[in-house]
Amino acid sequence: MKELTKVEEEVMQVIWNRKKGLVRDFIEDLPDPKPPYSTISSVVRILEKKGFVNHKAYGKTHEYFPVIAKDDYRKFVLNSLAERFFSGSPRALMSFFAREEKLGLKDMSEIISEIKKAEDND
C-alpha cells in the first residue's frame, strides 16, 4: 500500500463516505471552490492505479467504489508515522499525542478502555 497525496486522500475520503459513485458525485461532495471534472477524474484514475478504488462500467459511465477500507488505510498511515518518527514504537507515538494534545486522565482512560475491548475481541 502507498500513502496518498493530500488531494488523493481528500477524494478518497469522499469515496469512503459515499461507498460508491460517479466522478460528478464526488465533486458534489468536495468543498467549494469545486475542482474541474477533469482534475477529479484524473485523481480517481490514479487512485484506481494505486489499488484504492475499482469501477463498474455501464457503457461509457464508470461507477467507482473503494477497494481498501478506511480503517486499513488509517492503520497503514499510523504505522508508517510510527516507523518514520518514533522508531516504530506505538508507545512513543501515544506518549507524544498525550503530551502534545494535552490529553486528560478521562481521555486516557477512554483510550485504555478501547484498547482492552480490542484485546478482548482478538
Predicted regions mapped to residue ranges:
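Short, hydrophobic-biased segments on the C-terminal half of alpha helices
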Residues: 41-45
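Amphipathic alpha-helical dimerization/coiled-coil segments
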Residues: 77-120
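Short beta-strand "wing" residues that participate in macromolecule-binding interfaces
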Residues: 55
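Short alpha-helical segments that sit at the start of domains
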Residues: 1-13, 69, 121
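Pre-recognition alpha-helix immediately N-terminal to the DNA-recognition helix
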Residues: 9-14, 25, 92
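Short, cationic-aromatic polyanion-contact patches
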Residues: 4-7, 58-77
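Short acidic, hydrophobic short linear motifs in intrinsically disordered regions
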Residues: 20-29
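Glycine-centered, phosphate/nucleic-acid-interacting loop/turn motifs that mediate DNA/RNA or nucleotide
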Residues: 51
